Amino acid sequence: MNLYLREKVIIVTGGASGIGESICKKLAEEGAIPCILDKSKKNMERIADEITQQYGINAFLVFTELTDIHSCKSAIDSILLKFGRIEGLVNNAGINDGVSLEDGNYEKFIASLNKNVGHYFTIANYVLPALKASRGTIVNICSKTAITGQGKTSGYAAANGERLALTKEWSIELIPFGINVNAVIVAECWTPQYASWISQQANPEEELKKITSKIPLGNRMTTPEEIANTVVFLLSVNSKSISGQFFFVDGGYVFLDRRIS
């Protein structure tokens, strides 16, 4: 299937590792130009080298502190200065920081919202004029915690609920401009962040086996590449009639949150 993404300029926040990295590589495979917004210069440079070697595409790298609105604006300005256009945005960056109701406080909760959803709005706000010009696309990466809860993670769960709400809201607000907006919901996906969490468990191997045994399709973790495949389709012209939708790429996991059942 031709996704018609060649030479399309696509922003990926948090594109220097995990799911974001896989999205950038899949975009490059389709001939698109990934613009990586991240604060890990080392990882960005590594990924850019790999993309050039594998696909002959030069990714555009912008060191960005996503919790700083000035850094966000500067990043978008630099992309527009370089290319003069933007066809797509993937809001992806975030971290499950464990801010709970019992052990957290107001300041920690607001900080969690800022780092996990504030930049979804900020980046989209700065990119909007370019997306209006290109009749582009937004894809918001979200966590299943917004749907199922998890426990001990009020900040992250609330932020992801907001990501889903923004997906619905923007899909309506942006209808006049031909911009479609969708969300991809991630559950148990094997990323460096997830691997770090597993390693902190009392018995990592046993915990991982317990989780995967409750994932219906294949009893295995979702891969970042599987998330990327869905995201890249949603960025393509083949999905322009789809908007305001939530796509669960999770091996059927969220139908019943089996890890806590």
Each language-model region and where it sits:
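Short C-terminal tail/terminal secondary-structure segment
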Residues: M1, T148, V232, S243-S261
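Conserved glycine-rich cofactor-binding loop
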Residues: V9, A16-S17
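Short, small/polar-rich loop/turn modules that mediate ligand/substrate recognition or access, typified
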Residues: V90, I175, N180, I242-G244
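Substrate-binding pocket helix/loop in short-chain dehydrogenase/reductase
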Residues: S100-L113, I211
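Active-site helix of classical SDR
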Residues: A124, A159, T167
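Alpha-helical segment proximal to the catalytic Tyr-Lys
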Residues: P129, I172-P176, K240
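Residue(s) in the substrate-gating loop at a strand-loop-helix junction
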Residues: S143
